[in-house]
Amino acid sequence: MTQNSLPSWSSLQTHYEKIRDAHMRDWFAPENDPAPTRAERFAFAGGGLAADFSKNRITDETLKLLVQLAREAGVEKRRDAMFAGAVVNPTEGRAALHTALRATDPKAPFYDQVQAERARMAAFADQVRSGEWKGYTGKRIRYVVNIGIGGSDLGPKMVVHALHHLATPEITTHFVSNVDGADLYNVMQQIDPEETLAIIVSKTFTTLETMTNARSLRDWFVEKGCPESALAKHFVGVSANPAEVVKFGIAKENVFEMWDWVGGRYSLWSAVGLSIMIAVGPQQFGELLAGANEMDQHFRDAPLEKNLPVLLGMIGIWYRNFFGSQSYLVAPYSEALHFLPSYLQQLEMESNGKSARLDGVMVDYPTAAVTWGEPGTNGQHAFFQMLHQGPTIVPIDFIAVLTPEHPLVSHHPKLLANCFAQSEALMLGRTLEEAKKVAGADKPELAPHLVFPGNRPTSTLLVDALTARSLGALIALYEHKVLVQASVWDINPFDQWGVELGKILGKVVEADLTAPSVDEKKHDSSTSALIARARAALKK
């Protein structure tokens, strides 16, 4: 039986046909919204976070059926298997134990191993932060450069930026990911090799982009006067392949381990987060883990009807598989969370952008939606026009931090007001009759342009304050949401075979770009023409 033939899926399809034309404006009308109100019935909390799902195109019956689908699809079974360390990544024969990295129960899988490596990280981070760790000329470290890509970059970069207000002012952290030399070169202009520590992060330590940047940075250190014998003072590695790290030239004692039972996009809780720990300190890193662990416990223990990751995930299923939404927007009204949308792009689309079910049969229903976003209020002046008046319905997750992490507190009411007002405007809209009044009797032709359809669905997540703990809970919420949706779609969220083919062909094309001659029949006519054009340019 395929997922979309489950009884609850069929019930949801019937239910969708029944309510698809209903307008939330009518549901919120006082005469239709007696106590307990929608705002009360669709308010949930967990892991220190609060959620308002009331401005979604759902009823009590919708949530009941969505939870029923989650049960029928085996969400609980898959969740429990993941926490237990079972092989939930069958295509690679691996567990997915990112939750073990923040577990506090000594009975958790790999507990002693995780604690030992974290203690090594903490000792090293303290040395760097205190100034005890010195470069080859005896100066303290003032710059940390994290070189990695994908999960080795997006998570740490997002967290370091989000917790900037908690970071030591003595150290500036830079992130380099792109193989475009401009990325590394721009950072080189801002650092002093005598005061720089490079953290090279790669699960295999063979990743093209990471190793290209790592070699260039190592060469730059030597060119600037660092003896090769002193590079150990400036380079550390994080990898599941320690032998390859040592082969690169990093001292064995400077290698921090990650494990193959942790996927890259779930790895910021491990030594991949060393740049985070150096920036904010071991104590705050521990708070980050504690917040994630709190959400883990909520995900494990809360009934599905009140389970934040389950509800967030199933509401996403509702729009993707029944309304046919192609994308969804993440709009954090927090500049500190600037990089959260790009982090979630990888988490959601690399995890669930799949077409093959666990049994190898192709799905006949949509899976991951396009994830995108920008912090508020910037997005309001870029793409909110489309959200309000375009023909496409895009579900939105608003994220609001209720208290500021900076001293410019007078800005904050304006920020929150915009967030809440956008959710209200998207829900209510503006009718043609209302638009005519706004246009005025002298410009009736303007009225159609002032109509807002409304009925645009939004969820609002509330964070009391942006702390390491609350950030950890927020990240874990989305991690578990991904698992919930993968369970419903019957796909594997822990592999990423889709990135492999381009890598393989990329090596062939790279060789052709620099070879003395090229067999034009090796590639299609378009690719051959692109290679020829590039070869001519590179020879100039």
Swiss-Prot record:
GO terms for cellular component: cytosol. It catalyses: alpha-D-glucose 6-phosphate = beta-D-fructose 6-phosphate. InterPro entries: G6P_Isomerase, G6P_Isomerase_C, Phosphoglucose_isomerase_CS, SIS_dom_sf, SIS_PGI_1, SIS_PGI_2. One of its GO terms (biological process) is glucose 6-phosphate metabolic process. Keywords: Cytoplasm, Gluconeogenesis, Glycolysis, Isomerase. Pathway: Carbohydrate biosynthesis; gluconeogenesis; Carbohydrate degradation; glycolysis; D-glyceraldehyde 3-phosphate and glycerone phosphate from D-glucose: step 2/4. Its EC number is 5.3.1.9. This is Glucose-6-phosphate isomerase.
